[in-house]
Design a protein with these regions (language model features):
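Short alpha-helical "recognition helix" segments of helix-turn-helix
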Residues: 174-183
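Short acidic-glycine-tyrosine-enriched beta hairpin
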Residues: 42-57
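An amphipathic alpha-helical interaction segment
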Residues: 93-149
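Generic protein-terminus/edge-of-domain signal
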Residues: 1-35
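Ligand-binding loop in jelly-roll beta-barrel domains
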Residues: 59-90
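A cytosolic small-molecule/anion-sensing beta-strand core signal
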Residues: 32-33, 48-49, 67
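Short beta-strand segments in beta-sandwich/barrel cores
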Residues: 27, 34-39, 52-53, 61
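A short, Lys/Arg-enriched amphipathic alpha-helix from helix-turn-helix/homeodomain DNA-binding modules
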Residues: 137-173, 195, 199-200
């Protein structure tokens, strides 16, 4: 069932990489813990804990959720005739909007209380002004290349390397080529890391 407004409380125990596609709904994404990365055009933006990001309907993007990431998301159907922001970007949530999202996470799905809260969320969202800003982490992620000594944590470097391995696999590269290019020919390490980060073999 597709509702006009929906709230999702999602956990990603493993690396989750979504294909680039146009958004079918307007979405407000907030990261509770972990890290999400959204790619718009050729730029990637890190969405860190406590940050809120607006994705308008029709926006071409791809989302990456790092392992152990917890997010809240409100989706608004195109059936709604309200004037939602058409620009993707970070938003500074009002105190009320933050409180509403926190309350929604503890409220029974599709209950009368949740529906009332979602109606107020919609009114708050209609007043947002999204803008794109490059944080220090976003800049490092955009500059990162396999094997380079970027100023990022070992964990993030590992996740970005495995995301690159997945991309190579999808483009038709053989496993032996991926292992040689990204893991110095160490097949055992590659297989172990795939299970650790993806929860399965690539």
């Amino acid at each position: 069932m597709n509702y006009a407004i929906e709230f999702h409380d999602a956990n990603y125990p493993f690396l989750n990489v979504a294909a680039r596609k146009k958004s079918l709904k307007h979405s407000l994404l907030s990261v509770v813990s972990g890290l999400a990365i959204i790619k718009l055009g050729k730029q990637e933006y890190a969405i860190e804990p406590g940050q809120y990001f607006w994705i308008p309907q029709g926006c071409l993007s791809s989302l990456t959720f790092l392992p152990n990431t917890h997010v809240h998301r409100c989706d608004f159907s195109v059936r709604l005739n309200d004037a939602f922001a058409q620009q993707a970007g970070f938003i500074k949530p009002s105190i009320l909007l933050k409180a509403l999202i926190e309350k929604l996470a503890k409220t029974e799905t599709r209950s009368d209380i949740q529906l009332d809260l979602l109606a107020v969320v919609k009114h708050e969202v209609l007043a947002i002004s999204p803008n794109l800003s490059n944080s220090a982490l976003s800049q490092v992620i955009n500059q990162w290349k396999p094997g380079c000594e970027a100023r990022i944590s070992r964990e993030l470097c590992l996740v970005l390397t495995l995301r690159e391995a997945r991309k190579m696999k999808l483009s038709g590269k053989k496993e032996s080529q991926i292992v040689e290019h990204l893991f110095a020919g160490n097949t055992e390490e590659y297989e172990q890391l795939c299970f650790l980060v993806f929860g399965e073999a690539l």
